[in-house]
Structures are given as C-alpha cells and as structure tokens.
Amino acid sequence: MVNLGSYVFVFVALSLTVVVPSVQAHIAEYDEYWTQRQTNALRETLESYDPNPENVTDHFNYHAALAMETTGIVNETRRDLRQVGRGKKTTRRGGRFESLNAIDKCWRGDKNWDKNRKKLADCVLGFGRKTTGGKNGPIYVVTDPSDNDLLKPKPGTIRHAVTRDRPLWIIFARSMIIKLQQELIITNDKTIDGRGAKIYITGGAGLTLQFVRNVIIHNIHIKQIKRGAGGLIIDSEQHFGLRTVSDGDGINIFGATNVWIDHVSMTDCSDGMIDAIMGSTAITISNSHFTDHDEVMLFGGTNKDVIDKKMQITVAFNHFGKRLKQRMPRVRFGLVHVVNNDYTHWEMYAIGGNMNPTIISQGNRFIAPPIEDSKQVTKREYTPYPEWKSWNWQSEKDYFLNGAYFVQSGKANAWSATPKNPIPRKFAIRPQPGTKVRRLTKDAGTLGCKPGKSC
C-alpha cells in the first residue's frame, strides 16, 4: 500500500519564494481594480493551500470507500472503514443509484433535486472540497441566450449573471445554445448549474476565472471554443476593462481558488480544455467527459511560475475519451491527485509534466493505444533521468490494459523528516481499485436531469 503521507510532500517543508504573477493574462490595462483583485487572489492562494495534502487525499478515499459499501455502515470511523471495499461484495438495494461514485451519490438519488439545488454544494470532494459557489445567494434564472452587449449585458443573460457582485446560483429557464462574443469573465461566489436543461457554450469564446474564488461549474457542454479578439469587456458589476486576445481555452483558471468543475462535457477547444495556472489552487475536476482534443489540461503555465508550488488539484471520476492526444493533465510544480478516472484513449501520453510536480495516481484505468511508442502513461518533459528520478510520481491500484504502464519515481514510503499531522498508517484508506472505474465513471459528462425525477 502506498502511504500518501510518506512521500508526498517533501516540498512542503522547503522554503517557498512566492512570486506574484507577472503575466498580464489578457488584461490590456492593469488599473487599480485589477491590481487589488490580484493582491486578493494571491492572499487566497496562500490561505487555500493545505500544508497537509495527504489528509485531503485520504479524506477523498474515505468517502469513495464509503460510497462503494452499499450495504451501509453504522459506525463511520476511520477504524471501521479500514476494510471498506477490500473484497466485500456490494448489494444493490436502491437501484442504479447504489452504484454511483462518492460525489454523485451525495445528491443524485433525490427526485426533488430541482427544489434543493444547493445541496450540490455539499457534495464536492478533493482539494476543491471547500467550494460552495453561489450557495449563500439567491437563484438567478438565465432566460436569454444572447451575448450582444459586452459592457452593459442584458438582464437575464449569462454575462449579466456572472458579473454581479454578490453570490448567485445561476440556472437556466430552458435549453440554450450560447455563443459568447468574448471570454466570459466570472466573479466570486458563483454557481453555473445547467441541470434540467441542455446548455451549450459553443462556437465562441470560453469561460475565464481570473483572480476569483469560490466558483462551481456544473452540467454544461463546452465545445468548439474559439479565441476572442479582445476589447472592452465587463468584468464585474462596477468595472469593465480592455482585454487582449483570449487563448481559446474552454475554461481558463488564472490565479483562482476553490473551484469545482463537475459533470461538464468538453470537446474541441482552440487551446486547452482546462488550464489552471498562476497560483490557482484548491480545485476539483470531477465526473466530466473529454473528447476530440490535443492538449486537454495544463496545470502550471511556465517554468518561472514558482507560485504554482502552491497548486493542489484533484482530478476524479472523469472519462478521457475518443480522439484525445495528451495532457490529461500536464503539470508543473504543485500536486495533483489523479484518482478513479477512465483513460480509454490517448495518442502521445496521458499524464506528464516537468519542474518536479507531485503526481499521485490511484485507482485509474489506463487503456493504451495500439501505437507501441505511446503505451507509457507518463512523460517527463524536457528533463533528464538523473533529475526526474527523485520526483514523486506514484501509482497505486491502477489498472493497465493493452500494454499500458506507468513509470514511477521517487520514494513511495519515505516519510518527510518533519511531517505535519500525518495520517497514521493503520488508519489510511485505500483508494478504490482501477477495476471499478468503469462503474464509477459511467455517467461522466452532462446529465439529463428532469425535475421531479432522480437525476
């Protein structure tokens, strides 16, 4: 058994020089407003960073094990859960909802989900577990799919909703196809909840989370995203600014904290599908489906951005599907917990990186492509073996098919010299094995939720 507390996080004890993000990030004019947002975001990054990340990964595996033990557990302590999922047969007592993963099982069995939408905010696991989005605000109903005014957006449009300076839980009156004229700049404390409708963000620009905190993006399609030309764009209720050309990412997370992306279907973006850079941390990406793309996820933008040592991201219960090539994810610095995902397609590699990131791969299924040179799951980029051999890239209970293999490095059980509140080994919870991934990810992507029926 790999013990996360033992190898992960030697860099935690090291001194960390914090570098304020220097990239302008498509902000043509860095005025007082953006300077203050950047300062606030840096503070949020430092406060959101968990110095004991092994506790977070163990917490995730605890709940994953609990969800799989469908016969029920009376005493939900760590000691009692040590044997959860270790060879026990599960009993289907409640129909298909007994087989859901730990996040979905929290809310999907409720046929009145539409009357209690905010229950969703209680269900996130992983590094983004403190994300609540717009839970503390009112419901905002998007009634108009247009995006015609970038400075004074029409009430009822999604651009009007996401730029309000207060928490909002944003839902949709009906199914919509939304073509964004320019990047959609989202403010703090927002939930975009597409349940009950088919919501497509397509044919235009993507979503931008820049120097913000506490955002949930749930149950929408994002496809065929293009670069935006820039110009004057509203970025909060009281401010607009001049933007340069946007990258064409589906979701661009820049200096943002406490972000949860769940049940999103993504296809064919001009640049990355999801980029998390420049001090972004406390993020969970779950239950999503990705197809038809080259560079899927980039975590850490450049070799100079040492602020990304604070990056902590959970990637869980996702399906990496047809016609994907690479970066699922590609990581610089930081730590990524890749757990219970289904990797059915890649052309070059699945998980890669440089600049000494920590990558914990647990209970994933990797099905290698027929290309002999591409069967290795991992790729250390632009780094010689003598350097990367000490990086902590670990695989536990992964399931490898068609010749797939994961090249590990680092010391799996080398305890940090000064661990802070480590989980005792006898209480550590094992991840669910990769052999169960097909079941755990069977509903990845958007859901066809209907009011009055279990989702």
Swiss-Prot record:
Keywords: Calcium, Glycoprotein, Lyase, Metal-binding, Signal. Ca(2+) binds at D247, D271, D275. It holds the Pfam family Pectate_lyase_4. InterPro entries: AmbAllergen (IPR018082), Pec_lyase (IPR002022), Pec_lyase_N (IPR007524), Pectin_lyas_fold (IPR012334), Pectin_lyase_fold/virulence (IPR011050), PEL (IPR045032). Binds 1 Ca(2+) ion. Required for its activity. Glycans are attached at N55, N75. GO terms for molecular function: metal ion binding; pectate lyase activity. Its EC number is 4.2.2.2. It catalyses: Eliminative cleavage of (1->4)-alpha-D-galacturonan to give oligosaccharides with 4-deoxy-alpha-D-galact-4-enuronosyl groups at their non-reducing ends. It is an enzyme of class 4 (lyase). The active site is at R327. Residues 1-25 form the signal peptide. GO terms for biological process: pectin catabolic process. Its cofactor is Ca(2+). Pathway: Glycan metabolism; pectin degradation; 2-dehydro-3-deoxy-D-gluconate from pectin: step 2/5. PANTHER family: PECTATE LYASE 18-RELATED, PECTATE LYASE 6-RELATED. Belongs to the polysaccharide lyase 1 family. This is Probable pectate lyase 6.
